[in-house]
């Protein structure tokens, strides 16, 4: 890849959902082509149908692999790789089938393989419906865990990132009642380390400020409302001092921490569980938050919304999250492949 713009594999997600629609809308303008060369991994007929719906005049350029693409293919064509063929009757808005769910898996597997082989610099994944996928044999809680298995990664951290707020999660898709037992010093150290490394290497921050949220109300109030802050969170944070390039502080009461981070006091927050971290970021970045997988050997971002079957084919799906996800993948790829691996806590 000699082009200065990184190639980003863009998986379609569920072709029966809004994935094709938001891709068609996002790629109808030249904006994304200015920061990267997007390569859609998905179904050509689904994309063409969505392009017609959006009024896009671009043509789909079907490839077998990224290596077939010229260094500068221009912005008048949308490169696409179709790892599996689907019939027209398989792709009905809002009605996923065993065939389409199987195709979704192939899209992800192919994009990851291209990234591991160096044929693309990053992967941006479209929305999938985990419940429908599970009905048809998908045995992972979600994208993040599947990517962890495909890349053989020991630990992957889920981050939601917006222009004013970034949040990593210590635990992801877990019942709230199970969260306290899942937290331990070594696990939290690793989550903090992976987040700190990504802030430097992928986000390009020279001296990031990372804050850790408490688990309990008022961060436990010195043990009155729980001892996790005393026995787990503080030891994990203290073990990372003296700090390296990243300053790590906390644990802070979560009810005020996110406002402080949003105001610019911190560059990112480590939250203890799913809704603690995702409620505030979706409140302020509902249309432009990006799901980022940290700790992988590849760059991976994703839209921060689902398949929205009720909007598929209506032209009302909003492409903002997809546009932001591709732009962030391009930025992360540029930073990662231009930089030397950082030394972090």
From Swiss-Prot:
Pathway: Cofactor biosynthesis; pyridoxine 5'-phosphate biosynthesis; pyridoxine 5'-phosphate from D-erythrose 4-phosphate: step 4/5. The keyword Transcription regulation does not apply. It comes from the Bacteria. Binds 1 divalent metal cation per subunit. Can use ions such as Zn(2+), Mg(2+) or Co(2+). Keywords: Cobalt, Cytoplasm, Magnesium, Metal-binding, NAD, NADP, Oxidoreductase, Pyridoxine biosynthesis, Zinc. GO terms for cellular component: cytoplasm. Substrate binds at residues 143-144, 282, 291, 300. SUPFAM superfamilies: Isocitrate/Isopropylmalate dehydrogenase-like. A divalent metal cation binds at residues 173, 218, 274. Its EC number is 1.1.1.262. It is found in: Cytoplasm. GO terms for biological process: pyridoxal phosphate biosynthetic process; pyridoxine biosynthetic process. Catalyzes the NAD(P)-dependent oxidation of 4-(phosphooxy)-L-threonine (HTP) into 2-amino-3-oxo-4-(phosphooxy)butyric acid which spontaneously decarboxylates to form 3-amino-2-oxopropyl phosphate (AHAP). The active site is located at the dimer interface. This is 4-hydroxythreonine-4-phosphate dehydrogenase. It comes from Syntrophobacter fumaroxidans (strain DSM 10017 / MPOB). The lineage of its organism: Bacteria, Pseudomonadati, Thermodesulfobacteriota, Syntrophobacteria, Syntrophobacterales. The gene is pdxA.
């Amino acid at each position: 890849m000699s082009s200065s713009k990184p190639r980003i594999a863009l998986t379609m997600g569920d072709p029966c959902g809004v994935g094709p629609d938001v891709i068609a809308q996002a790629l109808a303008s030249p904006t994304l082509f200015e920061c990267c060369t997007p390569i859609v991994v998905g179904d050509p007929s689904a994309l063409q149908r969505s392009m017609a719906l959006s009024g896009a005049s671009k043509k789909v350029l079907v490839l077998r692999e990224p290596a077939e693409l010229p260094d500068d293919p221009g912005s008048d064509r949308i490169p696409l790789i179709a790892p599996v063929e689907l019939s027209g009757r398989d792709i009905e808005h809002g009605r996923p089938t065993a065939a389409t769910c199987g195709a979704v898996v192939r899209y992800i597997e192919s994009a990851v393989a291209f990234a591991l082989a160096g044929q693309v610099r990053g992967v941006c994944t479209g929305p999938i419906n985990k419940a429908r996928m599970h009905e048809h044999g998908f045995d992972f809680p979600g994208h993040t865990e599947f990517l962890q298995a495909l890349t053989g990664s020991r630990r992957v951290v889920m981050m939601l990132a917006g222009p004013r707020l970034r949040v990593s999660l210590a635990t992801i898709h877990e019942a709230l009642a199970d969260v306290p037992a899942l937290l331990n010093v070594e696990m939290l150290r690793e989550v903090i380390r992976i987040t700190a490394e990504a802030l430097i290497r992928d986000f390009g921050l020279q001296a990031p400020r990372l804050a850790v949220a408490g688990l309990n109300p008022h961060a436990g109030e010195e043990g009155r409302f729980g001892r996790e802050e005393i026995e787990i969170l503080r030891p994990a944070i203290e073990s990372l001092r003296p700090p390296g390039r990243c300053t790590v502080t906390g644990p802070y009461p979560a009810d005020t921490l996110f406002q402080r981070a949003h105001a610019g006091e911190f560059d990112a927050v480590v939250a203890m569980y799913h809704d603690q971290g995702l409620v505030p970021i979706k409140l302020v970045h509902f249309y432009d938050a990006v799901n980022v997988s940290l700790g992988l050997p590849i760059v991976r971002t994703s839209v921060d919304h689902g398949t929205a079957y009720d909007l598929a084919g209506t032209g009302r799906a909003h492409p903002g999250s997809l546009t932001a996800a591709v732009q962030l993948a391009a930025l992360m790829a540029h930073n990662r492949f231009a930089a030397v691996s950082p030394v972090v806590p």
